[in-house]
Amino acid sequence: MKILLAGASGAIGQTLIPLLIQQQHEVVGTFRNPAHAARVQSLGATPLVLDALDARAVTDRVAQIKPQAVINQLTAIPSRIDLRHFDRDFAPTNQLRTEGTRNLTTAAANAGVEKFIAQSFAGWPYAPRGITLKTEEDDLDPTPPPQLKPSLDALETLEHTVLRESRFTGIVLRYGPLYGPHTSVALGGNGLPDGSMIEDIRHHKIPLIGQGTGVWSFLHIHDAATATVAALNQAQRGIYNIVDDDPALVSEWLPYLAECVGAKPPMHLPNAIARMMVGEHVVALMNDIRGVSNEKAKRELAWTPKWASWRQGFREALG
């Protein structure tokens, strides 16, 4: 199968290309920065410099390539996110998820693409109520903190854009918070630095806010890639949560991660002080978000995460 992988130089893209090549797919990998060409080519894909925000260029290139499938992994997430200015740091990614996705879906539909897979997110967008794990049928948060609203709006726009197009099979993968190579939760090596979150934990910059009652559903970067391959091979139109099997309280995973990287336990910060220092949205991420179920993906995609628990993944697979 000929596949156009948009965002090939990103964390998931770099992990995904070799898996697609192993299955004998022909991959054209796009990226905006020409400096990424050698890396994408070394992984086995045909490199292509393409600005997803240039609608005419996207239309022309997709028509020339004539892929059977498009995989949209477009992001522009900075290597270090200032959570106090979450909306600012995610603005370029939000633009790619709205305008870039619109350009890609229009071009794909006009070019006869059969399947379109797009990256979304399951980490915090679900409504923070109830105690059961969130499924694909549950509502997203109708009243997110203001700092998170632009990103949630962009994710909803992306999902609607992909799923409403009738000329191809639209698939949305809601990945959990990622860890492992090329992510912010990664150990360095081979000339690469630690991920920014690991650096901050080592320097005691990430406190445990409040009681740490937020529930996170993590995902190793390798499992994000294998789930994407499974979706390419088997998925029907719809949304799939892609997370591990072990939802985790912040009060459990944050001290454990600190221990795994040889850092001191995180300090505690009361909610009231944290609201003043970093904002209500960070307090919500630490205390309010709910865990996510992967049962649909396991059942319908015949997919199982290799790193079924963040506990093993943090110990063995950060680098």
Regions inferred by a protein language model and the residue ranges of each:
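Amphipathic terminal alpha-helices
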Residues: 308-319
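Substrate-positioning beta->alpha
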Residues: 150-157, 183-198, 209-232, 238
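Mid/C-terminal beta-alpha module of Rossmann-like enzyme folds, strongest
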Residues: 2, 15-18, 225-281
